[in-house]
């Protein structure tokens, strides 16, 4: 059975379960981070063509996505950082946050002839501006330029949490926005902006979601807590996601997983929706989230450079959709 046929069958069943005849006239608005944008747009196009609700998706930073939910200007949002308790308290309608997929965060670089393997201390020294020449990393001498996110980003939050976990020498703290050293560094907006900046500039290196690596931008192998050097891929990132323990709000992280074979920098991606006050859009919102968590949709995640959820985490995510109410 084709994916489109499976999706059509799924939405037919969801329509019956929700007591409605179809979702064809349902239109939902969403915003979210750039990391999974291609995946979500692909999902939403298939949903609409298979009898599901139509969903618009605009790429913004994680802070902007969460702010849109707080301001109640969207039906749901997508973030690569969970909402903090102080922000959850600002949403009177309540929030459900549901892990949908995961991602590795790579050290992407453009330095031909260099097969880069970084210890955890080197990761920290690089990102804090203490390495400025490629010869310090065992490569041919040349100026090194650090590329960082200019926008407020969950990727930056997850990345800096890992840097802090890697070494007590990390001096910049953690968060979605960091004051990076200005020397030998340039800023770029979004994962795509970081990828473009690295690709255009020989000698550049920065952090970005694995799904945005392309062209001349390669991923460094990073030392994990077990002492192994792992490149970011489906297998090594999936092992790292297993180390994440979710709390009662389904938030969680593992900034330096100890599992053998695990890539050391990963994050989850969450859908943030309202617990109540969804009105006539309730069935469509539930159907959209049920679709994202379906085996059919999850089977497409890896094709776009992200990490599908394994059975244990799916078993925690799927029941939460039922908390979304009118």
Regions found by a protein language model. Give the residues of each.
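Bacterial N-terminal signal peptides that target proteins for export
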Residues: 1-9
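C-terminal segment of classical bacterial N-terminal signal peptides
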Residues: 14-22
């Amino acid at each position: 059975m084709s994916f489109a046929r499976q999706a059509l069958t799924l939405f037919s069943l969801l329509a019956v379960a929700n007591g409605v005849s179809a979702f064809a006239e349902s239109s939902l608005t969403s915003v979210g981070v750039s990391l999974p944008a291609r995946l979500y747009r692909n999902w939403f196009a298939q949903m609409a063509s298979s009898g599901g609700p139509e969903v618009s998706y605009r790429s913004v930073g994680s802070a902007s996505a969460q702010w849109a939910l707080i301001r109640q200007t969207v039906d749901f949002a997508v973030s690569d950082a969970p909402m903090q308790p102080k922000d959850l308290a600002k949403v009177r309608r309540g929030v459900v946050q549901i892990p949908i997929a995961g991602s590795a965060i790579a050290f992407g670089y453009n330095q031909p002839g260099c097969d880069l393997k970084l210890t955890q201390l080197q990761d920290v020294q690089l990102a804090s501006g203490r390495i400025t020449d490629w010869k310090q990393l065992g490569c041919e001498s040349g100026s090194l330029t650090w590329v960082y996110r200019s926008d407020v980003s969950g990727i930056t939050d997850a990345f800096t949490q890992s840097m802090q976990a890697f070494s007590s020498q990390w001096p910049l703290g953690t968060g979605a926005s960091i004051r990076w050293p200005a020397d030998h560094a340039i800023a770029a907006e979004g994962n795509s902006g970081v990828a473009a900046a690295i690709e255009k500039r020989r000698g550049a290196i920065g952090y970005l979601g694995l799904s945005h690596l392309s062209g001349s931008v390669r991923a460094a192998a990073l030392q994990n807590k077990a002492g192994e050097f792992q490149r970011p891929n489906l297998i090594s990132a999936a092992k790292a996601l297993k180390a994440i323990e979710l709390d009662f709000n389904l938030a969680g992280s593992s900034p330096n997983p100890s599992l053998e074979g695990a890539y050391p920098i990963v994050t989850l991606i969450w859908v943030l929706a309202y617990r109540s006050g969804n009105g006539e859009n309730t069935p469509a919102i539930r159907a959209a989230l049920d679709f994202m968590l379906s085996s059919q949709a999850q089977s497409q995640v890896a094709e776009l450079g992200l990490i599908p959820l394994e059975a244990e985490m799916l078993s925690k995510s799927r029941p939460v959709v039922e908390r979304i109410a009118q």
